[in-house]
């Protein structure tokens, strides 16, 4: 009798008694979406599927088709639309329709396993909707809801969330991401992971690393500096690991600086496991590691997806000593640890499933992330006396999800026209009746495998929307544009003719319901833009470099992604990062006007802000804090988001909210030292309602250990800034600084101290040994400061 998998302590013995073939089958994935079970060792299979917006029906079909016992059936080569449709059609009707067709009958039974009682899957809001909420509580709540949905149908690992950075507006999968700012992405990612894993399934943060475009995604190298990598593109993963305790991370298709992520020891082992301290399971994106299985395992990959994989070459590599069995054992150990943690969590956390509650959570999330961009003369919410006509095909057919991994096959849908009629009784569609208000719904789709061609809305609406809005204004009507979009769109042509603009992004199956609630005032728009909306694409930071040249994508904008770049270049935008209106009004002010932060004793800085709802409706405000280092050692943005808090208040209600700022929000990565540094000294703190709407500012003095100890490599300017350092240098040099004219010192501020002293003192002390000893004594004294 062999060892049994019962807990983490049992894993070493289980691994020791597994056969080589069992180990290889474990890391090679048994079928498309689940690992190999070993019944006599009590090792269960775990099911890994997309995604963060709900169950991906294609995965359900592929997992059945890739069973090794069906390898000879030609119809199992790929999932047909007819097969995938079984995730949403009536299963009783499907069973009758395919009676006598063994494969399709089996697929009906497979679909039924994922649809208990024939129920429909829920399509949840996209990542951009969640990021737009600017609220970790919302992110955690929707994460838990998605986890409950997936657990109910037997999924153990969800391929999500997508914690990449929205680098360029045309990125095909930007709508899956939480935004353009690393602090926003970090807080949202960690909260979503906590929520999902609280439902008893594992989250899988993706795609590691610098996966920001779909063009040539399998061959492109993202070329960026270590600083940019750490400050921006690794930040969401770091937060998911440290604050979310994510159990699984997925590698990306792309290369980074010439090394494909799935084969890179530098990224998977040195960075992810070493610097970011990840101890969970690393899985490949589908097909990203299939060409060199031996190489990907050696680099640090634990699970090669999708299965089944032919592991013959890996077996030979182990037998010939080219791949250490110890390495293979480590990979198997990580998978078994994942299995144990999932099963322990599922025993500890009762399964919960309430479809109505999940749909309500989805709807509230859309409302919390809906961004009111424009609202002249308080057109919204629409008064009950308004006679409304809807225009645009998307008024009847909501763009609910993107294509590819986030696509959810379901018969649950909603649209704003039908839902508005349920609430208000009557609304026309595309006819010039006696209506006094026009609502035009426009969309901008996106999805996996292809980047957006432009920032335009769908072709059917590009000229039509402007013409219809113009005509409505000529008739004296009020006009509202409902934006059902994957990211920023061009607005110059039509925005002047819109009294109001409301953005619901890619909302999932409850999009129509939420939109109707927002239009009628049953809900308040609580979102803020998680990405900048530029006036034109040519103004965007990555425009000269996106999507790259051949198979190279050069991240030439560096740390100046999104609002950081527009602020640095003083470029006007259509709508700035963090902006969004409410149906009510707020007063927001700092409670203090001067801040000191001793980082040696305080992990966080709490900034008290007084917020009052001075309007007539309940609503929410997002208090944002930005910071600036006054004398940075390296090129830094003028302002960066360092903290935010969402406040919900009734009319007349007032509160003081403490906005928390972490050390990580203010640090920077010094590539020369190859480590994080925590700047000290003078900073400015900005209270804002967007990256542009600054309400107040206050000085912030940060105290702590100097990340740049004073020594011979320090500049003359740095020495002069520190009175004690200046005094010490004068002691060792007989008053050098007092003897040099000020205009000469001003010219020398960027010269290194060692260069100046070595040249000047050698003339006085020609004995180099003695001189070196004196200088070392000086530098030792400086280092004590």
Task: Name each region found by the language model.
Residues 663-706:
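Terminal connector regions
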Residues 75-79, 731, 785:
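Low-complexity, acidic Ser/Thr/Pro-rich "mucin-like" tracts of secreted and single-pass surface proteins
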Residues 1-667, 682-686, 691:
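Glycoside hydrolase catalytic-domain context in secreted enzymes
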Residues 347-360, 434, 695-722:
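Phosphate/pyrophosphate-recognition segments in soluble nucleotide-handling domains
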Residues 706-774, 779-782:
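Compact, charge-rich alpha-helical regulatory domains located at protein termini
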């Amino acid at each position: 009798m062999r060892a049994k998998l019962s807990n983490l302590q049992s894993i070493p013995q289980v691994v020791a008694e597994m056969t080589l073939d069992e180990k290889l089958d474990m890391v090679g994935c048994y079928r498309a979406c689940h690992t190999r079970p070993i019944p006599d060792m009590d090792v269960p299979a775990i099911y890994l599927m997309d995604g963060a917006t709900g169950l991906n029906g294609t995965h359900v079909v592929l997992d059945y088709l890739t069973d090794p016992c069906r390898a000879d059936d030609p119809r199992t080569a790929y999932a047909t639309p007819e097969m995938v449709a079984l995730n949403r059609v009536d299963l009783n009707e499907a069973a009758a329709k395919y009676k006598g067709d063994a494969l399709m009958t089996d697929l009906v039974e497979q679909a039924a396993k994922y649809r208990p009682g024939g129920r429909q899957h829920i399509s949840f809001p996209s990542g951009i909707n969640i990021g737009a909420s600017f609220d970790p509580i919302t992110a955690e709540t929707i994460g838990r809801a998605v986890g409950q949905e997936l657990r109910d149908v037997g999924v153990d690992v969800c391929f999500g969330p997508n914690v990449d950075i929205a680098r360029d507006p045309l990125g095909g999968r930007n709508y899956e991401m939480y935004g353009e700012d690393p602090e926003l992405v970090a807080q949202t990612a960690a909260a979503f992971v906590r929520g999902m894993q609280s439902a008893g399934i594992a989250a899988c943060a993706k795609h590691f690393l610098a996966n920001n475009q779909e063009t040539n995604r399998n061959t492109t190298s993202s070329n960026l500096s270590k600083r940019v990598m750490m400050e921006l593109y690794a930040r969401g993963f770091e937060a998911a690991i440290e604050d979310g305790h994510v159990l699984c991370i997925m590698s990306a298709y792309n290369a980074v600086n010439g090394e494909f992520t799935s084969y890179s020891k530098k990224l998977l082992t040195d960075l992810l496991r070493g610097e970011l301290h990840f101890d969970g399971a690393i899985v490949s994106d589908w097909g990203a590691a299939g060409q060199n299985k031996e190489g990907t395992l050696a680099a640090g990959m634990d699970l090669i997806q999708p299965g089944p994989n032919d592991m013959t070459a890996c077996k030979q590599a182990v037998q010939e000593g080219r791949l250490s069995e110890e390495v293979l054992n480590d990979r198997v150990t990580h998978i078994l640890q994942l299995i144990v943690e999932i099963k322990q969590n599922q025993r500890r956390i009762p399964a919960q499933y309430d479809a109505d509650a999940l749909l309500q959570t989805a709807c509230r999330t859309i409302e919390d992330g809906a961004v009111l961009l424009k609202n002249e003369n308080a057109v919204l919410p629409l008064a009950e006396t308004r006679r409304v006509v809807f225009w645009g095909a998307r008024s009847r057919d909501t763009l609910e999800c993107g294509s590819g991994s986030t696509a959810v096959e379901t018969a649950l849908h909603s649209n704003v026209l039908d839902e508005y009629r349920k609430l208000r009784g009557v609304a026309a569609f595309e006819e010039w009746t006696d209506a006094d208000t026009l609502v035009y719904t426009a969309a901008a789709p996106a999805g996996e495998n292809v980047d957006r061609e432009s920032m335009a809305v769908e072709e059917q609406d590009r000229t039509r929307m402007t013409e219809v809005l113009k005509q409505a204004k000529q008739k004296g009507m009020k006009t509202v544009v409902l934006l059902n979009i994957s990211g920023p769109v061009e607005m110059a042509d039509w925005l002047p003719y819109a009294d109001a603009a409301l953005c619901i992004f890619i909302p999932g199956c409850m999009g129509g319901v939420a939109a109707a609630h927002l239009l009628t005032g049953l809900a308040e728009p609580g979102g803020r833009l998680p990405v900048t909306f530029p006036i034109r694409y040519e103004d965007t930071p990555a425009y000269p470099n996106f999507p790259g040249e051949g198979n190279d994508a050069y991240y030439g904008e560096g740390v100046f992604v999104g609002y950081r770049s527009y602020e640095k270049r003083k470029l006007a935008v259509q709508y700035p990062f963090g902006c969004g209106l409410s149906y009510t009004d707020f007063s927001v002010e700092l409670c203090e006007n001067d801040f000191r932060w001793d980082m040696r004793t305080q992990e966080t800085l709490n900034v008290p802000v007084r917020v009052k709802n001075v309007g007539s409706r309940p609503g929410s405000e997002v208090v944002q804090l930005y910071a600036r280092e006054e004398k940075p050692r390296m090129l830094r943005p003028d302002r960066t988001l360092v903290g935010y808090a969402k406040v919900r208040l009734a009319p007349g209600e007032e509160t003081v909210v403490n906005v928390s700022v972490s050390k990580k929000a203010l640090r920077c990565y010094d590539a020369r030292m190859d480590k994080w540094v925590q700047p000290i000294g003078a900073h400015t703190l900005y209270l804002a309602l967007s990256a542009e709407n600054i309400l107040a500012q206050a000085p912030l003095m940060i105290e702590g250990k100097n990340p740049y100890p004073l020594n011979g490599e320090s500049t003359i300017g740095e020495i002069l800034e520190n009175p004690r350092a200046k005094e010490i240098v004068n002691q060792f040099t007989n008053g050098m600084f007092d003897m040099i004219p000020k205009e000469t010192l001003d010219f020398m501020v960027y010269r290194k101290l060692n260069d100046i002293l070595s040249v000047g003192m050698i003339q006085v002390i020609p004995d180099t040994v003695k001189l070196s000893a004196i200088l070392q004594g000086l530098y030792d004294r400086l280092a004590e400061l």
